[in-house]
């Protein structure tokens, strides 16, 4: 089970970027089964003594619970919400980490309130494809963490501590699992010394695949996912004082159309005629909304008046585009295979309604510890993620609107810090970090192809009027070409520090 932090008699004064006084009294009732050392505050501390709200899982606990990724883990951490669904975008495209229900109405990573770190290094973009096979410990920290983690941590942060290669023993491991919907998950790793007691290496790989969970009206599958990844860590300890760690990670995801759909409030209205009290104490009478429990598939009414909610077009051979243009490959030629904007030329090419993503991550750290316990650390990381994604914009079987939403993300970070020994009564830490990010995207709509502009009066909005007119009419219109409206560039320079003083054996003052 997870281990929770316990503050028996502690006070934490969080200054600088956080500025709050925090006591996590609720954790007092949580049982402690084993001693876990965490590094959420850039130094090794006992989970039972650290003065912040933190939940930690060891590798043994992750394996015992059968957690394979962050989505499965999130259900065991109060206040943490994570799923592949990012805002209103179905599928594993723009996944968001949420703490205590806080979120932003932004599709880009720049304004995220919760972020993932690997060995304390910021991870830009998708987190779902990082498996737990190579993770030694997961630390979930709730509440503002800008003092130590920097940007995008107003609500909290998650830190993966990766396994350290052995300098003495050779080990290997193979894991395999299978589930419904033709799902399988296979991973393997090897670990051992290259130079006895001096240099070790750990390498691993993973294959994951899941078949369709639903079948669309056109016969295509919905919910198909596949991932393959590989990682390698080189660890060197040339002297007792110095340790060096280099890590590389690569992953590729290929998903089909998402198993998702929309439930329109106007057709499933259970609010009209009811009055509700808002948080501000005002009385409201909502209309065309869903009140209470969300209706399930088979009960809810979809946008076409039927009862099949999980549905969409899965083929690039659009019948409506053929009626309008006479070209059965109009959608393929003018959207899926259309040349990218020059700023997005490196994203993966796609051939159908699908999502493809590639990720590269490199990181390195150097740590030196003197005889008096003072430790100096220098670390840096580089992330590169490129995505291309074509979807049925309406998520209904209506042959109407399609979009292609590519994005290119790249960042690097550098950090240096120095800390006193942790066994003394007065402890200190200080450091500086630099972060640079480039995010190029068209997630505000990207390339859009509308094959249905005209509608039939009296029928649901967007219902196509069959029209074999030539392409010069409004029924087949191509709009936009990667306007890259979501593009941004970020540079951040930060300085952080922390002081701790044991006033008594039972009472510690922390200033950050």
Whereabouts are the PLM-identified features?
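Periplasmic-side early beta-strands and strand-to-turn transitions of outer-membrane beta-barrels
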Residues: 159, 168, 175-177, 191-293, ...
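Structural signature of outer-membrane beta-barrel domains
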Residues: 43-45, 123, 179-181, 208-212, ...
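A surface-exposed, glycine/aromatic-enriched loop/edge motif typical of exported proteins
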Residues: 244, 248-331, 437-467
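Transmembrane beta-barrel architecture of outer-membrane proteins
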Residues: 24, 65, 94, 155, ...
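Secondary-structure transition into beta-strands, especially the periplasmic turns and strand N-termini
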Residues: 28-32, 135, 167, 182-184, ...
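Acidic, small-polar-rich N-terminal luminal/periplasmic segments of exported/outer-membrane proteins
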Residues: 33-167
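Extracellular/periplasm-exposed beta-strand and loop segments of Gram-negative cell-envelope proteins
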Residues: 177-179, 214-223, 259-265, 325-356, ...
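Outer-membrane beta-barrel translocator/receptor signature
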Residues: 112, 125, 133-136, 142, ...
